[in-house]
C-alpha cells in the first residue's frame, strides 16, 4: 500500500469523526432544544426527553399530565407537517427568533419549515406553562402507557 494512502487511512481512523460514539442530533431537534431553553431557561432540555408517555421517542396510551399532553400535541403536529410534500419534521430547519423568552417564527420559511417551526414554538410555550412532575420522568412505559 502506498505510504500516503496509509497515512490518510490512519488519520480517518483516529479522527474525532471516526472515533465518536455520539451521533449528531438532527438539526431540527437542535433548534427545538434551543426553543425549549428559551422558554424554560431554569430546566435542562434533557428533562423533557424522557418524560411521560409522549415526551421523547414515540408515544402511546394516555398522557400522564399536562406536560405529557404538550408532547402528544407536538407529536400530532409533526404528523400533520409530514403531510406536506417532502416535509420531514425531524430534519427540517427553519428561521426563528428568541427574545426574552418569546419565540417568533420568522417569515421566509417555506410551508414545511413554517409548520415545523410553529409545532416547536407551540410545544416550547406549552412546556413553559405546564407543571413538571419529577415522578413522571423516565417512567415504566409498559406499565403506564398502554
From Swiss-Prot:
Expressed by the venom gland. Residues 1-21 form the signal peptide. GO terms for molecular function: calcium ion binding; calcium-dependent phospholipase A2 activity; phospholipid binding; toxin activity. One of its GO terms (biological process) is arachidonate secretion. The active site is at 74, 120. It is an enzyme of class 3 (hydrolase). Ca(2+) binds at residues 54, 56, 58, 75. The keyword NADP does not apply. Binds 1 Ca(2+) ion. CDD domains: PLA2c. Belongs to the phospholipase A2 family. Group I subfamily. D49 sub-subfamily. PLA2 catalyzes the calcium-dependent hydrolysis of the 2-acyl groups in 3-sn-phosphoglycerides. This is Acidic phospholipase A2 D. It comes from Naja sputatrix (Malayan spitting cobra).
Amino acid at each position: 500500500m502506498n505510504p500516503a494512502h496509509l497515512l490518510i487511512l490512519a488519520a480517518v481512523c483516529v479522527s474525532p469523526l471516526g472515533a465518536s460514539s455520539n451521533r449528531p442530533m438532527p438539526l431540527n431537534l437542535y433548534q427545538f432544544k434551543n426553543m425549549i431553553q428559551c422558554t424554560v431557561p431554569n430546566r435542562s432540555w434533557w428533562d423533557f426527553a424522557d418524560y411521560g408517555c409522549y415526551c421523547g421517542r414515540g408515544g402511546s396510551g394516555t398522557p400522564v399530565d399536562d406536560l405529557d399532553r404538550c408532547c402528544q400535541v407536538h407529536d400530532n403536529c409533526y404528523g400533520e407537517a409530514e403531510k406536506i410534500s417532502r416535509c420531514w419534521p425531524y430534519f427540517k430547519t427553519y428561521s426563528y427568533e428568541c427574545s426574552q423568552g418569546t419565540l417568533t417564527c420568522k417569515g421566509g420559511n417555506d410551508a414545511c419549515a413554517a409548520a415545523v417551526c410553529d409545532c416547536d414554538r407551540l410545544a416550547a410555550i406549552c412546556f413553559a406553562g405546564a407543571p413538571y412532575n419529577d415522578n413522571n420522568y423516565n417512567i415504566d412505559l409498559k406499565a403506564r402507557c398502554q
